[in-house]
């Protein structure tokens, strides 16, 4: 294959459920290895924690009690040297609703 038909693709996965994230990353890596292309990853990126503190009481009367809510966003990074055929196969992978995927051609 010529260099023009092979491109480097950076796949960024992120979501709130780390188990689903790891499953999708494993499927992508297995598919790439089966197709015979070079793979780097999955590289775990730092988990982002979104914290929200809210007051329990609806009015200003009474005790000062608060609830703390947290949302953790986990991220993974995979680099693949892929052709158009491999990219088309990547599009067929079933992805849960908790996982979002970004593809970037480098």
Curated annotation (Swiss-Prot):
Q: Which Gene3D superfamilies match?
A: Ribosomal protein S10 domain
Transmembrane residue ranges: none
Keyword annotations for this protein?
Answer: Ribonucleoprotein, Ribosomal protein
UniProt-listed GO biological process terms: translation
* InterPro entries from the UniProt entry: Ribosomal_uS10, Ribosomal_uS10_CS, Ribosomal_uS10_dom, Ribosomal_uS10_dom_sf, Ribosomal_uS10_euk/arc
GO function terms (MF aspect): structural constituent of ribosome; tRNA binding
Q: Which GO terms describe its cellular component?
A: small ribosomal subunit
- Record keywords: Membrane included? no
Pfam families found in the cross-reference section: Ribosomal_S10 (PF00338)
At the top level, the lineage of the source is Archaea
UniProt function note: Involved in the binding of tRNA to the ribosomes.
Q: Which family does it belong to?
A: Belongs to the universal ribosomal protein uS10 family.
Query: How is the quaternary structure described?
Result: Part of the 30S ribosomal subunit.
Q: What is this protein called?
A: Small ribosomal subunit protein uS10
Species of origin: Pyrobaculum calidifontis (strain DSM 21063 / JCM 11548 / VA1)
Taxonomic lineage of the native organism:
Archaea, Thermoproteota, Thermoprotei, Thermoproteales, Thermoproteaceae
